[in-house]
């Protein structure tokens, strides 16, 4: 029996989002850059892993730079983005590098805000490592 040919529906037209929000989540192991519209709907993202790094190299500033560049270039080309507000979360080494990479890629940064969660004496932290 011949296979039925599946027809695709109409392709979604790309919407233009001139202003967005870049969320940079920087941990010691990885840096994830997510670019959203002002409502919070994800448009594009990049991380140390999607930039081609594995293991401990994902946490490096260079991996964060490449991840931010990838996300920014896609946001500019596909969504016509020009301006971003940057929300930085976490203590990782890729924080500043990712912000610089967004600026170098051609996005105008209008606001940088640190939204790292700080406990008001919440859960007990893990024990100190003895190396």
Curated annotation (Swiss-Prot):
GO terms for biological process: translation. One of its GO terms (molecular function) is structural constituent of ribosome. GO terms for cellular component: ribonucleoprotein complex; ribosome. Gene3D superfamilies: Ribosomal protein S11. Keywords: Ribonucleoprotein, Ribosomal protein, RNA-binding, rRNA-binding. InterPro entries: Ribosomal_uS11, Ribosomal_uS11_bac-type, Ribosomal_uS11_CS, Ribosomal_uS11_sf. The keyword rRNA-binding applies. Signal peptide: none annotated. PANTHER family: 40S RIBOSOMAL PROTEIN S14/30S RIBOSOMAL PROTEIN S11. NCBIfam families: PRK05309.1, uS11_bact. Located on the platform of the 30S subunit, it bridges several disparate RNA helices of the 16S rRNA. Forms part of the Shine-Dalgarno cleft in the 70S ribosome. Part of the 30S ribosomal subunit. Interacts with proteins S7 and S18. Binds to IF-3. Belongs to the universal ribosomal protein uS11 family. HAMAP family: Ribosomal_uS11 (MF_01310). This is Small ribosomal subunit protein uS11. It comes from Dictyoglomus thermophilum (strain ATCC 35947 / DSM 3960 / H-6-12).
């Amino acid at each position: 029996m011949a296979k039925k040919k599946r027809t695709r529906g109409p392709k979604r037209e790309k919407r233009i989002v001139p202003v967005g929000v870049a969320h940079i989540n920087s941990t010691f192991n990885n840096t994830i850059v997510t670019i959203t519209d002002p409502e919070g709907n994800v448009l594009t993202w990049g991380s140390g892993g999607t930039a081609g790094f594995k293991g401990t190299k994902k946490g490096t500033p260079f991996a964060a730079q490449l991840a931010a560049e990838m996300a920014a270039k896609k946001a500019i080309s596909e969504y016509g983005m020009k301006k971003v507000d940057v929300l930085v979360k976490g203590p990782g080494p890729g924080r500043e590098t990712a912000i610089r990479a967004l600026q170098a890629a051609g996005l105008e940064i209008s606001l940088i805000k640190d939204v790292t969660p700080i406990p008001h004496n919440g859960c007990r932290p893990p024990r100190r490592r003895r190396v």
